[in-house]
């Protein structure tokens, strides 16, 4: 699959922009804070309905304007899709596929699969469990609409249970209703735990091989799913900690407390790995993500690289660039030295200056 073009109106610092992409490598270069990342954000938003930078639509609307429009044309298995997205202040975003409005955002998922790689992703190993859960959920929601539905349901039930726990401080008589939410939480939570475990097992096979090659055949990386409770024990554990949950007014066990273990040998590199090991592992994880998406959808996802090359040494740069030759890639960077040095083929080059984009014919 490829993104054929993107049109932006009043999106971030762009008043009116129309870009046609090559099916190979597309590079956007320029100084910081010129609008390079905004183009990648618009692409990611078109496929996932979410921004990697903010949670509120109004933050993406150009200053002084009331609404924003994004039109993305995607070609997938010889079929063309036009995705229109309207962002407005204090209103839910409007989405249409081939000019037909959709009622649920989940209807969009699966049309445009992407892998987003930014400098922040290099810290996924050393950051807290929430970042690693966000990674799991982001990838699974793109690939599995049932998982997306289950996760949405689980979060709603979790919020209701937590609200009830807080209300019980003043209304002890509400305790009898807690079991209703517990049953629903366990039923949905078990599905999430099982699907995450399956996903991590599949990902581990790929990440091990890739990391072994990147590390010069020196390191064996193991990726393991760490649920806060095994699915078969979820109901019993939730009952066991009920009094504690009531005191703390929060749900202390469940998939919302899960984690991913990254280990090399017997070493937990989340805590004890060197920066080099953590960054190489993060790169291995992202490259594995591309391969797993390929296997899952029998197509190649679009790769978005947001100023990540400057954070990698020359060996990792080289490995990354050589791994994406058959993938449509949108890259942002401040300069082109890495590509010249690595003799990397570039299909299209765009110079970005203060919200204007100019295509260049050569480096």
Where are the predicted features?
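Structural recognition of the conserved hydrophobic beta-strand(s) that form the central parallel beta-sheet
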Residues: 72, 328-335
């Amino acid at each position: 699959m490829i993104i054929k073009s993107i049109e932006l109106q009043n999106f971030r610092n762009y008043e009116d922009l129309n870009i046609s992409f090559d099916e190979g490598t597309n590079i956007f270069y320029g100084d910081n804070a010129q609008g390079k990342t905004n183009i990648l954000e618009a692409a990611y938003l078109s496929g996932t309905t979410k921004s990697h930078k903010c949670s509120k639509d109004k933050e993406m609307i150009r200053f002084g304007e009331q609404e924003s429009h994004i039109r993305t044309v995607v070609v997938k298995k010889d079929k063309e899709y036009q995705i229109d997205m309207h962002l407005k202040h204090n209103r839910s975003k409007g989405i249409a596929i081939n000019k037909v409005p959709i009622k649920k955002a989940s209807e969009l998922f699966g049309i445009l699969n992407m892998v987003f790689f930014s400098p922040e992703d290099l810290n996924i190993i050393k950051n807290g469990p929430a970042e690693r859960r966000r990674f799991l959920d982001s990838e699974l929601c793109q690939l599995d609409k049932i998982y997306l539905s289950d996760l949405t349901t689980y979060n709603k039930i979790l919020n209701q249970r937590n609200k009830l726990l807080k209300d019980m401080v003043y209304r002890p008589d509400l305790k009898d209703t807690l079991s209703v939410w517990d049953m629903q939480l366990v039923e949905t939570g078990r599905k999430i735990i099982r699907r995450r475990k399956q996903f991590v097992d599949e990902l581990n096979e790929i990440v091990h091989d890739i990391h072994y090659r990147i590390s010069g055949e020196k390191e064996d990386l193991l990726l393991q799913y760490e649920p806060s409770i095994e699915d078969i024990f979820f109901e019993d554990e939730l009952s066991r900690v009920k009094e504690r949950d009531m005191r703390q007014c929060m749900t202390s066990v469940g998939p919302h407390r899960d984690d991913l273990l990254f280990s090399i040998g017997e070493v937990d590199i989340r805590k004890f790995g060197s920066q080099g090991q953590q960054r190489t592992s993060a790169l291995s994880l992202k490259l594995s993500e591309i391969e797993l998406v390929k296997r899952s959808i029998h197509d190649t996802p679009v790769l978005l690289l947001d100023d990540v090359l400057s954070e990698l040494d020359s060996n990792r740069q080289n490995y990354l660039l050589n791994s994406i030759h058959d993938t449509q890639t949108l890259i942002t960077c401040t300069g082109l030295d890495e590509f010249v040095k690595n003799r990397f083929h570039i299909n299209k080059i765009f110079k970005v200056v203060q919200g204007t984009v100019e295509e260049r014919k050569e480096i």
